[in-house]
Regions:
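Structural motif
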Residues: 48-55, 98-107, 141-145, 182-196, ...
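Intrinsically disordered, low-complexity segments enriched in Gly and acidic/Ser/Thr residues
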Residues: 244-253, 257-340
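A short beta-strand motif characteristic of beta-propeller blades
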Residues: 62-75, 111-120, 151-158, 202-215, ...
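Residue position within the beta-strands of beta-propeller blades
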Residues: 45, 91-93, 136-137, 176-178, ...
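An edge-strand/N-cap motif at the start of beta-rich repeat modules
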Residues: 23-73
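Repeated scaffold domains used in trafficking and secretory/extracellular systems
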Residues: 28-35, 71-87, 120-132, 160-171, ...
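Blade-level signature of beta-propeller repeat domains, shared across WD40, Kelch, NHL, RCC1
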Residues: 338-369
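N-terminal Sec-pathway targeting helices
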Residues: 1-19
């Protein structure tokens, strides 16, 4: 081998080493990860770097499994909805580091114990939604659709940039709220109800209507859900158009989409935001700690519109640091509440926390089998 050949060989080896250094992590990152499913677990707590299995034993938390597995590399926006699909998959978006860099969509399969990632520009940057089988992501100018395998099925581009709110629908007709990203001629951002159909893996805009109009004020609307022909959305108040003065309230907006009837239902606490669907007609509603100065949630019945506020401030949470992360219902009288670095066992009938346990501070979701 002459000197020239040796030099070329050395250069080739160096190039291959450099390529391996940069490509191997990306290749490994795209491969599915696996974790063990425990037959003893009644529910799992999902964190950035682990999945813990638990059951309740005489109302006390008993850990039955703890698997270390890297799930989140960047960060999750806690205000963006996570989807549970087909009673099997937890699907959510994460943002890359630093904030705003290309993110990815993740699916955790709780039937076979598999975690898949899909790197994409079309992750849920500002909001997301779901129906029983599909996950919808949105930024300021689009809504995209993913199935449980993380295959992107379609992407709709809005004519005008729009900021959407998180939503939950039952079937293939999607209803969600949004406002134009830019102000109109009156320097306002009116709220709209969007109606999309989703058939043959295609998103189609069917209708866009003004959600609620009242002279001289503009209302704030947050997350929404649809049951039958009824739309429910959290509303944290309004601002006066002339002065921009904010009036903070606590209400649920109720819209009968058949009759056109619209009403506001008062809640026991101000500044509602995220919705957590529980069993039957029960919904947990998170409230902004900035305005309420409390950590807790409202339990709201969709049928009779009754509600009560569950104040968790007495359990040592810091209203400036801690936040509500998830609420799940495991039977008619029991809620699991993930807040800060604790999981709480809450009994509905007695308005009592029966037990609590510290968990990993990066825990973000409860999966109930």
């Amino acid at each position: 081998m002459n000197k020239k050949t040796k030099k070329l060989t050395l250069i080739l080896i160096v190039v291959l080493v450099i390529l391996a250094f940069f490509l191997t992590p990306k290749l490994l990152d795209s491969l599915p990860k696996h974790f063990s499913i425990s037959s003893d677990a009644n529910f799992y707590i999902v964190g950035y770097h682990n999945i813990e299995g638990y059951k309740l034993d005489d109302s006390e938390f008993k850990k039955v499994s703890d698997e270390k597995v890297d799930i989140v590399k960047g960060q999750i926006n806690p205000t963006v909805k996570r989807a549970e699909l087909s009673n099997r998959y937890l699907v959510f978006s994460e943002e890359g580091k630093p904030h705003g860099v290309i993110g990815r969509v993740t699916a955790i399969d709780f039937k076979v114990g598999e975690i898949k990632h899909h790197k994409t520009d079309d992750y849920a940057y500002t909001s997301s939604g779901s129906n029983p089988d599909y996950y919808f992501t949105s930024a300021s100018n689009y809504i995209a659709t993913f199935d449980s395998t993380l295959k992107k099925l379609d992407k709709y581009i809005f004519e005008k940039p729009a900021i959407l709110s998180d939503f939950s629908n039952e079937g293939n007709h999607l209803y969600f709220l949004g406002s134009d990203a830019k102000t109109d001629s009156n320097r306002q951002n009116p709220n709209y109800l969007y109606h999309f159909s989703f058939h043959d893996n295609k998103l189609q805009l069917e209708n866009k209507e003004s959600l609620f109009e009242q002279p001289e004020v503009t209302y704030y609307f947050n997350n929404s859900l649809v049951r039958g022909n009824y739309l429910y959305a959290t509303s944290s108040g309004y601002h006066k158009d002339s002065t921009k003065e904010k009036v903070i309230l606590g209400q649920i907006f109720h819209y009968n989409m058949d009759s056109g009837t619209k009403e506001f239902i008062d809640l026991p606490e101000i500044a509602p935001s995220n919705l957590y669907e529980l069993k039957g007609d029960l919904v947990a509603i998170e409230h902004s700690t900035v305005y309420s100065k409390k950590i807790g949630f409202s339990l709201f019945h969709l049928t009779n519109h009754s509600s009560q506020f569950i104040d968790l401030s007495e359990f040592g949470f810091d209203v400036n640091k801690d936040s509500l992360k998830d609420v799940k219902q495991i039977d008619d009288d029991t809620l699991l509440v993930l807040v800060g670095n604790k999981i709480l066992n809450y009994q509905i009938s007695t308005n009592t926390v029966l037990s609590q346990k510290e968990v990993d501070p990066h825990s973000f979701h409860i999966w109930v089998k």
